[in-house]
């Protein structure tokens, strides 16, 4: 066992002495040491109950013949950090989480791991850390929240609360109605109930085979979720007790090129958050898998969008997907669609021979999964769209790419030309939009919010929700080198690369410039004569924000742009 380096031999008597102080007995030194990477945090609705989950897992590990050691990571609640300087820390927290997983697991030479994430950056951070450690690892998330509901039957989620702010500002709803939405949008524990970033990433863990079936959709705080925890605990001990299985199920043997590909396929079929692109690119880099934005468009062109979930469809949430057959049913349906991409089976775009943590191939896992409700998960022949729910755009404004969640865009916005209204920060944009600077026919430009320029690549849910709440969602577009919450909907294009801080063309846009967006062509263009652009470039001086935080200053110096997953460079 890997842990023998800290528990075997006369030279390790001091190490065992310390371990005995924690309650270990003689017999425990012959058992596998299992790390439990928890993310229990009181302030996050998807995490405040995870201490109970860890207890269940620890009990089951002990009963199965292992020794559990729990440790914790940090986490940022993007909803609470939204719209103020707290959001600067959200994306950087992903790197801290990855580093902490690597540090704890390798410093103590633990044999295997269970990760308990749930929200936002915590899932990708743990995935990146697990790839570095490369021991058998199972992901079992906290689970999604139930959707909220008003007395009149209106279905709610967190996005409802954000958009209600814009509606209230415009006088479209009363203060009483705003309060009712506030009090009912998030009815209890769990990751926010739509196909936002947390649930998108938890779903992709199923697609990659690193989690058990149901990980992305079984509700938080349910008996079914508790059983999932127990199954994960029993399975990880079974693997850790067997030397052959320990080698077979090393994390990189599961999360490999096939797994990354399968994740993007499911992402397209379910219209996941645009953040998944950023995170999966970072995960691919950790896995040493060659994957780029062009690869994503190639997949999107061959995957039908068969599950539309909030924010794209406000009445459908993760509990509905679970009831309708879950992620396995989505994958089974996707697998039926003929496609030919790469070297995998010619009759499926999914790599059905990909290994999963249960020991089955992906094909074996999903073979018997069926769509129970085709109004929630559609069949291929009745898909919402013949192509995937996310699209990479290119053009003079995005030479290295930009991301659009096509699944949440109205038809009227898929071919759009408008005049620019420019803001050099999210804070400026929020004031400008709320103050009436943005009108129908405008393209809101929010720049210097990329990974370097922000720093930290803030999410833009507050400005996008204001636009929607003010009734401008089908007449105003928004482009940014920042990113969006998974709850964002509308003609919102993010991750523009190169970003303003590195001299991207977005930095040279002026108020009134015409900008053209074409989903059919996959383009994002500034319609300004090249000579004028060059003249502006000679006069351009980058806006350098004062960064007081030592951590954010280091992050700004080391981070790559969004097209490269916003990962930290290891060489300067």
From Swiss-Prot:
Matching Pfam families: ILV_EDD_C, ILVD_EDD_N
List the PANTHER family: D-XYLONATE DEHYDRATASE (PTHR43661), D-XYLONATE DEHYDRATASE YAGF-RELATED (PTHR43661:SF3)
**Which regions form coiled coils?**
none
Q: Where does Mg(2+) bind?
A: 78, 120-121, 459
Locate the N6-carboxylysine modifications and list their residues. 121
Active-site residues, Swiss-Prot/TrEMBL: 485 (proton acceptor)
Protein name as it appears in the record? Dihydroxy-acid dehydratase
Cofactor, how bound (note): Binds 1 [2Fe-2S] cluster per subunit. This cluster acts as a Lewis acid cofactor.
Which Gene Ontology cellular-component terms appear in the entry?
Answer: cytosol
Cofactor entry: [2Fe-2S] cluster; Mg(2+)
Subunit organization: Homodimer.
Please report the organism this UniProt entry assigns to the protein. Answer: Helicobacter hepaticus (strain ATCC 51449 / 3B1)
Report the enzyme's class at the first EC level. lyase
Q: In which pathway does it act?
A: Amino-acid biosynthesis; L-isoleucine biosynthesis; L-isoleucine from 2-oxobutanoate: step 3/4; Amino-acid biosynthesis; L-valine biosynthesis; L-valine from pyruvate: step 3/4
Query: Quick one: which residues bind [2Fe-2S] cluster?
Result: 119, 192
List the molecular function annotations (GO) for this entry.
2 iron, 2 sulfur cluster binding; dihydroxy-acid dehydratase activity; magnesium ion binding
Q: Which PROSITE patterns does this entry report, sorted A to Z? A: ILVD_EDD_1, ILVD_EDD_2
Q: Which family does it belong to?
A: Belongs to the IlvD/Edd family.
């Amino acid at each position: 066992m890997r842990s023998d380096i800290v528990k075997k031999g006369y030279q390790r008597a001091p190490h065992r002495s310390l371990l005995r102080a924690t309650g270990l007995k003689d017999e425990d030194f012959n058992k596998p040491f299992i790390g439990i990477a928890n993310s229990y945090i009181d302030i996050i609705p998807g995490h405040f109950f995870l201490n109970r989950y860890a207890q269940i897992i620890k009990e089951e590990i002990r009963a199965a013949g292992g020794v559990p050691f729990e440790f914790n990571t940090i986490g940022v609640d993007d909803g609470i950090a939204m719209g103020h300087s707290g959001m600067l820390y959200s994306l950087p927290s992903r790197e801290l989480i990855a580093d902490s997983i690597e540090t704890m697991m390798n410093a103590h030479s633990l044999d295997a791991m269970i990760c308990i994430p749930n929200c936002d950056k915590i899932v990708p951070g743990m995935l990146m850390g697990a790839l570095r450690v490369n021991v058998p690892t199972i992901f079992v998330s906290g689970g999604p929240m139930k959707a909220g509901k008003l007395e009149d039957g209106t279905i709610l989620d967190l996005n409802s609360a954000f958009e209600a702010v814009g509606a209230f500002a415009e006088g479209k709803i009363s203060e009483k109605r705003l309060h009712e939405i506030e009090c009912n949008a998030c009815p209890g524990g769990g990751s926010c109930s739509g196909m936002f970033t947390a649930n998108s990433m938890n779903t992709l863990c199923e697609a990659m085979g690193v989690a058990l079936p149901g990980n992305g959709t079984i509700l938080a705080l349910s008996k079914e979720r508790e059983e999932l925890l127990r199954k994960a605990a029993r399975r990880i001990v079974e693997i850790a007790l067997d030397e052959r299985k320990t080698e077979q199920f090393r994390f990189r043997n599961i999360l490999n090129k096939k797994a990354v590909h399968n994740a993007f396929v499911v992402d397209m079929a379910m219209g996941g958050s645009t953040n998944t692109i950023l995170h999966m690119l970072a995960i691919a880099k950790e896995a040493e898998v060659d994957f780029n934005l062009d690869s994503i468009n190639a997949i999107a062109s061959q995957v039908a969008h068969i599950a539309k979930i909030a924010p794209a469809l406000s009445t459908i949430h993760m509990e509905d997907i679970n009831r309708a057959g879950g992620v396995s049913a989505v994958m089974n349906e996707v697998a039926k669609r003929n496609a030919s991409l790469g070297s995998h089976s010619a009759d499926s775009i999914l790599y059905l021979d990909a290994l999963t943590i249960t020991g089955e191939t992906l094909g074996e896992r999903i073979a018997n999964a069926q769509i129970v409700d085709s109004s929630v998960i559609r069949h291929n022949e009745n898909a919402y769209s013949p192509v995937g729910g996310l699209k990479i755009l290119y053009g003079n404004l995005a030479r290295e790419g930009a991301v659009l969640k096509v699944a949440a865009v109205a038809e009227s916005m898929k071919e759009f030309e408008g005049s620019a209204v420019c803001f050099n920060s999210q804070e400026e944009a929020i004031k400008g939009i709320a103050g009436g600077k943005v009108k129908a026919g405008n393209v809101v430009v929010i720049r210097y919010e990329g990974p370097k320029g922000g720093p930290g690549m803030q999410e833009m849910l507050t400005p996008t929700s204001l636009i929607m709440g003010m009734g401008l969602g089908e007449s105003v577009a928004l482009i940014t080198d920042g990113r969006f919450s998974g709850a964002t909907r509308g003609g919102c294009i993010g991750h523009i690369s190169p970003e303003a801080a590195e001299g991207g063309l977005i930095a040279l846009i002026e108020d009134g410039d015409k900008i053209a967006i074409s989903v059919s062509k996959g383009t994002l263009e500034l319609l300004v004569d090249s000579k004028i652009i060059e003249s502006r470039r000679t006069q351009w001086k980058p806006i350098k924000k004062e960064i007081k935080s030592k951590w954010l200053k280091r992050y700004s110096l080391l981070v790559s742009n969004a097209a490269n997953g916003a990962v930290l460079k290891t060489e300067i």
